[in-house]
UniProtKB/Swiss-Prot annotation:
ATP binds at G176, G178, K179, T180. This is Chromosomal replication initiator protein DnaA. Belongs to the DnaA family. Plays an essential role in the initiation and regulation of chromosomal replication. ATP-DnaA binds to the origin of replication (oriC) to initiate formation of the DNA replication initiation complex once per cell cycle. Binds the DnaA box (a 9 base pair repeat at the origin) and separates the double-stranded (ds)DNA. Forms a right-handed helical filament on oriC DNA; dsDNA binds to the exterior of the filament while single-stranded (ss)DNA is stabiized in the filament's interior. The gene is dnaA. It comes from the Bacteria. Residues 110-119 have a biased composition (Polar residues). It comes from Rhodopseudomonas palustris (strain ATCC BAA-98 / CGA009). PANTHER family: CHROMOSOMAL REPLICATION INITIATOR PROTEIN DNAA. Residues 99-109 have a biased composition (Basic and acidic residues). GO terms for molecular function: ATP binding; ATP hydrolysis activity; DNA replication origin binding; lipid binding. It holds the Pfam family Bac_DnaA_C. Residues 129-351 are annotated as: Domain III, AAA+ region. Residues 73-128 are annotated as: Domain II. Residues 90-124 are annotated as: Disordered.
Length: 472
């Protein structure tokens, strides 16, 4: 892709991100690549049929309009599924950077022009492709991911028959913070010996496998293969759809846990927020160790950048990024590890293709589209409940209980009001998160506090103080 095409594609992606919002963009468009532009048509690709179908059904007009804003002559956008290439073993040396991946510090296992993945096959069930670069050795540990890394390492080092400490282990975070890296590292480490069977599956792969088994009347073999696994690793659980598929996942989850087998799951939100999943599944997932990977701090971002430069030198020995440039990138590219990966890739390409050393001026020009304005903090209902309980000297369980004493009712109403005004949750969902209350109860609380804050200056000050604490 020429520099002109790359710049054009970056602008189109920027328009698309602004149009649909960051969450939608990260979920559905982050792995979409530009293949070519010919006259009046654009050829894009995605790694899975599921993504292709969803984008074509829900966003085809949006994608076309974003391209037409850049190139008015475009009248057709073709979307295809790119095929992964398979390899045999994980890389033993420090990995070289490749094209950036959705959700992780490392690049996609399914990019045709990047890392070459490998599949793990166990009996009747084939696992999702594994990227040989995604190992514990290449994972950069920092304050925001220490607990997740330690828990994943504990799982990976377990032996068949050992007591299972964290089951299921549930890791959640925003896009590009290292979930898939850790899950694949668990799989590689677990399969390094011959003692245990460790299987890595994306939620999409699980869905397609189960549906295919139903169609071919091999569902029994599918179930037996899954339940014969010692460690089942499921990625991107938020994409698990369909009541029948969810029921089978729930049965598999219960069967493995009850048999003392390990389950590791990753998603982009905590179990309680997976509203599309059955309550039984959410409850079972929440019963294990739930670990959040927080946004990358500046020190961790700097560490990731340094590791990518070292990785690049395994193939390009003369490549170097001066410390001031690394510090600039760590300070200004704050969104996720994928953007940091992309920044190093761009500097490497520019330096090698133009035979120029990396400078601060070059970096400022090459990564300008990766520097995004600060986004407002995502506030969770659990945070609201915790801070309100602390403010009013009650417990979180009091807020969720049926108690109707004055010292509990008012804090509960304030918490519901803040949940409605500071989150995108619906009234029924807020009610469910406050002890299974009806949406009318939430609506009454919201209206009650709205009326009081306009007349009661003390309450108004308390609410504003709570908002500041939540937004810090």
């Amino acid at each position: 892709m020429s520099n002109m095409e790359q710049d054009r594609w970056s602008r189109v992606k920027g328009r698309l991100r602004s149009s649909v919002g960051e969450d939608v963009y990260s979920s559905w468009f982050a792995r979409m690549d530009l293949e070519s532009v010919h006259d009046e048509s654009v050829h894009l690709s995605v790694p899975t049929r599921f993504l292709k179908s969803w984008i074509q059904t829900h966003y085809s007009d949006k994608v076309l309009s974003c391209w037409q804003a850049e190139l008015p002559e475009v009248n057709r956008v073709d979307l295809t599924v790119r095929s992964p290439v398979r390899c045999a073993t994980p890389a033993k040396e420090v990995p070289a950077p490749v094209e950036s991946r959705r959700d992780e510090q490392r690049p996609s296992a399914e990019r045709s022009n990047g890392a070459t993945p490998v599949s793990a096959n166990h009996d009747a069930l084939g696992g999702s492709p594994l990227d040989p670069r995604l190992t514990f050795a290449s994972f950069v540990v920092g304050r925001s991911n220490t607990l997740a890394h330690a828990a994943a390492k504990q799982v990976a080092e377990g032996r068949r028959g050992d007591p299972v400490m964290f089951n299921p282990l549930y890791i959640h975070s925003g896009v590009g913070l290292g979930k898939t890296h850790l899950l694949q590292a668990v799989t590689w480490a677990g399969n390094a010996g011959t003692e245990r069977k460790v299987l890595y599956l994306t939620a999409e792969k699980f869905m397609y496998g189960f549906v295919a088994a139903l169609k071919t009347q091999t569902s029994l073999a599918f179930k037996e293969a899954l339940r014969g696994i010692d460690v089942l690793v499921i990625d991107d659980l938020q994409f698990l759809q369909g009541k029948t598929t969810q029921a089978e996942f729930c049965h598999t989850l219960n069967a493995l846990i009850d048999a003392g087998r390990q389950v590791v799951v990753a998603a982009d939100r905590p179990p309680a927020d997976l509203e599309s999943l059955d309550e039984r599944v959410r409850s079972r997932l929440a019963g294990g160790l739930v670990v959040e990977m927080a946004p990358l701090g500046e020190d961790l971002r700097l560490g990731i950048l340094r590791s990518r430069v070292v990785a690049a030198r395994t193939h390009h020995a003369s490549f170097d990024v001066p410390q001031p440039v690394l510090e600039y990138l760590a300070r200004t590219i704050t969104h996720n590890g994928r953007d940091l990966e992309g920044a190093i890739n761009r500097l490497l390409a520019h330096s090698k293709l133009n035979n120029q050393p990396v400078t601060l001026e070059m970096a400022e020009h090459e990564v300008r589209d990766l520097i995004r304005p600060s986004e407002p903090k995502r506030i969770k209902i659990e945070d609201i409940q915790r801070i309100v309980a602390r403010q009013y000297n009650v417990s979180r369980s009091d807020l969720l209980s049926s108690r109707r004493t004055a010292n509990v009712v008012r804090p509960r109403q304030v918490a519901m009001y803040l949940a409605k005004t500071l989150t995108l949750r619906s009234l029924p969902e807020i009610g469910r998160r406050f002890g299974g209350r009806d949406h009318t109860t939430v609506l009454h609380a919201v209206r009650k506090i709205e009326g009081l804050v306009s007349k009661d200056t003390t309450l108004s000050d308390e609410v504003e103080s709570l908002k500041r604490q939540l937004q810090e």
